[in-house]
Every structure is written in C-alpha cells, then in structure tokens.
C-alpha cells in the first residue's frame, strides 16, 4: 500500500532510487547486525551499483515530496526485511505460500470496502490480478528466497539494482523506447559494482 500511495507523491524515477537505496541500506545493516563480514570492497561495489541507478533515474526525477520519500523508504525497508527474513527459511515454497495466503486474507476487508463505493471491478481484472500475484510474483519470490541464501545480504541488495536496468533495457526492445547513453552508462556502473563486490 505504501508503494501505491507513495508514487502519488513522488516521481517514478525518484521513487525507484529511494526504494533501492533503502533496500541496500537495510540489507547492509542486516549484515552488520548479524555479524556477517562486510568487506570494504563489497560496500564500494554496492555504492557503485547504486550510483548506476542514480544515473538512470536522475534526469527524470520529477516531483519529490517528503511524504513520497517516506512512503517509498518504508516500502524499501519492508522489502529489505522480507529479504532478510528469507535467509533463514528452509522451504521457500511453503513460506511464500503462507505469506501470500495471510496477505490475501488481510486485504479482503479493504478491497470489499473499495469495491462497494469505488471503481468497477471486472472478472478479467480479477483474473489478471490473481495470475500476477499467485503465479508470476509468487514464483519469483520462491526463486529469490532459494537463491539469496547463498550470498550475503549486502550482495543480495546489490544484485537487486540490476532490476531497473533490465526494466529500462526491456522497454527499448518491447516498447521501442530510445537506447540512451545514460542507460548504457548506468548499466556499466551497476555491473561494475556487481563485479567489484563479487564474493571472493
């Protein structure tokens, strides 16, 4: 909910940067608190990758409000906590199923209130939402839970900075958006950061 309301008070590009910066900071903090070694080179790599996200998003930062920053930071912190929690899970599939079931039940009441006095809900919309949540999103969460336990939390946070780069690259292929020098530079920085901070 924070991400949905947050983007009403902050530009998409700026919100993206705030989100990934908070995720990265949260996962570095997790490593520190859990006494996981955090080599300086790994922190440098994380900062270089985050700089790549900054290069990608800065030109289109748009409107930035304190409320928008706060809500996207809360979203990033929540995802960092969810990621950190997954590091102790032995059965990613069962854990994700349980999480999604609890969330679905918790959202039934506000959805019912919204439907009763809000926008029209169609069968197609409900089916697509269910597929996106129960299939694509759930499978990606299971895969992420299974993979990220093999790397440090800091590295897990750094790896996630690839997502906005891949999204922008996909937009050039699928939506015909222009491939820019900034996108190339951002990609180079992100992947350079991953290489610098790679596990040794």
Predicted regions and their residues:
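Hydrophobic/small/kink-forming positions within alpha-helical transmembrane segments
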Residues: 1, 24-28, 54, 77-80, ...
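Loop-to-transmembrane-helix transition segments
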Residues: 1-2, 41-47, 67-75, 120-140, ...
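Specific transmembrane alpha-helical segments of multi-pass solute transporters/efflux pumps
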Residues: 1-19, 49-55, 133-151
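C-terminal transmembrane-helix exit sites in multi-pass transporters
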Residues: 3-5, 22-44, 54, 165-184
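Membrane-interface helix termini and inter-helical loops of multi-pass transporters
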Residues: 7-8, 54-67, 111-129, 172, ...
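Helix-helix packing/entry segments at the starts of transmembrane helices
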Residues: 15-22, 85-105, 137-173
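Transmembrane alpha-helical segments that form core, pore/gating elements
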Residues: 26-28, 61-115, 143
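Hydrophobic transmembrane alpha-helices of multi-pass small-molecule transport proteins
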Residues: 38-58, 75, 107-108, 161-162, ...
